[in-house]
């Protein structure tokens, strides 16, 4: 059995979801017999690094980030960041979402430390996090995406009217979102010029780049991809896609994570041909971005043709997240999924 450091929390807007992911990962790895060291990255950029491998996680308050951090620090003590430099771990299991956890930053840090980790590497993580760059790669590889524009904050401030006029060519409604972000945080459905101005100004308060994308009507689905090492070869498999029926206008943060916010159906209620096509494209997206270990790609099917919305390199891993749902539908246990992720991470570090 391995000594595994589980990283979760972080300073992104997805901190609370990452805590739930981290708790699920720790609990599962512990039942598998691994030695687990939970490492909490706090919302203000601090680290709580236990001095030893032991499980004393306050699962009972995992739905309350502030209480969780307080109780976690009581149990493990307040640590100094430099403790991470002497981390004794066979591998790091990443349960971070968004921000520096998903944009290649933590991956690069772990590579400097010489610690193998689960999931995609630095470059794939950075590209997938940048929605514009990812869309450009998808287009170059022959995949379909909705028409889009990227707007830089400086460009907007210098030529506001020209920028608004350009974005209006996408038509209404359209989706406005930070170029780097996840879990549909700060994503807005825009229906008119005034709202466009208002939400651009709002996003630019905390982000430097915005992407606006045409609104497509169709069936929303999401498809996970797992990598496995079998018979001396690396293999990629696509899981059964999940159909997303949002409780609101679209699959935003509330729909994703609030109870009753959306209805998720696995496998999706689509034709066998559409399912096969979605799975093929999910693997193609995974390969195009250079992902490793696992990923999850979101699509909207328009008149039978899937269009990529985005690829997530560290998809949610709570007990009710899409990857666990899809693995269950495929007859794959989460213990098996985690074993594969660990094996892929360890083998990748050898090359």
UniProtKB/Swiss-Prot annotation:
Pathway: Cell wall biogenesis; peptidoglycan biosynthesis. InterPro entries: ATP-grasp, ATP_grasp_subdomain_1, D-Ala_lig_Van_CS, D_ala_D_ala, Dala_Dala_lig_C, Dala_Dala_lig_N, PreATP-grasp_dom_sf. Mg(2+) 2 binds at residues 310, 312. Its cofactor is Mg(2+); Mn(2+). One of its GO terms (molecular function) is D-alanine-D-alanine ligase activity. Mg(2+) 1 binds at residues 298, 310. It catalyses: 2 D-alanine + ATP = D-alanyl-D-alanine + ADP + phosphate + H(+). Pfam families: Dala_Dala_lig_C (PF07478), Dala_Dala_lig_N (PF01820). Binds 2 magnesium or manganese ions per subunit. ATP binds at residues 167-222. One of its GO terms (cellular component) is cytoplasm. GO terms for biological process: cell wall organization; peptidoglycan biosynthetic process; regulation of cell shape. Keywords: ATP-binding, Cell shape, Cell wall biogenesis/degradation, Cytoplasm, Ligase, Magnesium, Manganese, Metal-binding, Nucleotide-binding, Peptidoglycan synthesis. It is found in: Cytoplasm. PANTHER family: D-ALANINE--D-ALANINE LIGASE, D-ALANINE--D-ALANINE LIGASE B. Cell wall formation. Belongs to the D-alanine--D-alanine ligase family. This is D-alanine--D-alanine ligase. It comes from Leptospira interrogans serogroup Icterohaemorrhagiae serovar copenhageni (strain Fiocruz L1-130). The gene is ddl.
């Amino acid at each position: 059995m391995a000594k595994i450091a589980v990283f979760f929390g972080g300073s992104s807007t997805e901190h609370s979801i990452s805590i739930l992911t981290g708790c699920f990962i720790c609990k599962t790895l512990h039942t598998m017999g691994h030695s687990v060291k939970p490492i909490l990255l706090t919302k203000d950029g601090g680290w709580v690094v236990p001095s030893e491998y032991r499980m004393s996680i306050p699962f009972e308050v995992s739905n309350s980030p502030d209480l969780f951090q307080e109780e976690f620090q009581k149990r493990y003590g307040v640590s100094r960041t430099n403790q991470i430099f002497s981390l004794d771990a066979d591998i790091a299991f990443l349960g971070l979402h968004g921000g520096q956890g998903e944009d290649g930053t933590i991956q690069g840090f772990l590579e400097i430390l010489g610690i193998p980790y689960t999931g995609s590497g630095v470059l794939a993580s950075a590209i997938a996090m940048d929605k514009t760059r990812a869309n450009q790669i998808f287009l170059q590889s022959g995949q379909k995406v909705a028409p889009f524009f990227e707007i830089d904050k400086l460009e907007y401030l210098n030529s506001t009217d020209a920028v608004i006029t350009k974005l209006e060519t996408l038509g209404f409604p359209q989706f406005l979102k930070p170029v780097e972000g996840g879990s549909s945080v700060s994503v807005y459905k825009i229906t008119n010029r005034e709202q466009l101005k208002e939400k651009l100004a709002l996003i630019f308060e905390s982000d430097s780049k915005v992407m606006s994308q045409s609104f497509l009507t169709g069936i929303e689905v999401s498809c996970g991809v797992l990598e496995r090492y079998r018979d001396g070869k690396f293999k990629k498999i696509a899981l059964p896609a999940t159909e997303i029926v949002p409780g609101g206008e679209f699959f935003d943060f509330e729909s994703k994570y609030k109870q009753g916010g959306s209805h998720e159906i696995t496998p999706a209620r689509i034709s066998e041909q559409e399912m096969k096509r979605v799975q093929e494209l999910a693997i193609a997206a995974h390969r195009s971005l250079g992902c490793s270990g696992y990923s999850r790609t979101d699509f909207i099917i328009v008149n039978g043709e899937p269009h990529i919305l985005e690829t997530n390199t560290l998809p949610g891993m709570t007990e009710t997240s899409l990857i666990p749902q899809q693995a269950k539908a495929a007859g794959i246990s989460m213990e098996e999924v985690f074993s594969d992720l660990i094996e892929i991470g360890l083998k990748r570090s050898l090359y």
